[in-house]
Amino acid sequence: MYAVIKTGGQQFKVKQGTILKIEKLEIEPGKKVTFKEVLIVSDGDDIQVGTPFVSKVTVEAKIISQGKGKKVHILKFRRRKHSMKQQGHRQLLTEIEIVKINA
């Protein structure tokens, strides 16, 4: 059984036991979170597609940790002007483990 959930403007295909890194959620590690925005649920040959979400289906997950992603380096270079600007960014992430798909 798998489901496609929407969180943080992204879509993720999840199964029970899947570990994901998603955009930061303001929840402490060890707590549980429920995703109600489920786009697709599949149980073998039985597939439910939502319009836009599947009703009465939720996905439960446990927060493992909070952290930052890899650093993204931004370099703006102006040729022949002896001008350069460097910048970096690290996205705040939450690591979750899918506990249960309630279909």
From Swiss-Prot:
GO terms classed as biological process: translation
Entry keyword annotation includes Ribosomal protein: yes
Keywords linked to the UniProt accession: Ribonucleoprotein, Ribosomal protein, RNA-binding, rRNA-binding
UniProt KW Ribosomal protein keyword: yes
Family classification: Belongs to the bacterial ribosomal protein bL21 family.
PANTHER family linked: 50S RIBOSOMAL PROTEIN L21, LARGE RIBOSOMAL SUBUNIT PROTEIN BL21M
Protein name (Swiss-Prot/TrEMBL): Large ribosomal subunit protein bL21
Organism: Vesicomyosocius okutanii subsp. Calyptogena okutanii (strain HA)
Classification lineage: Bacteria, Pseudomonadati, Pseudomonadota, Gammaproteobacteria, Candidatus Pseudothioglobaceae
Gene designation per UniProt: rplU
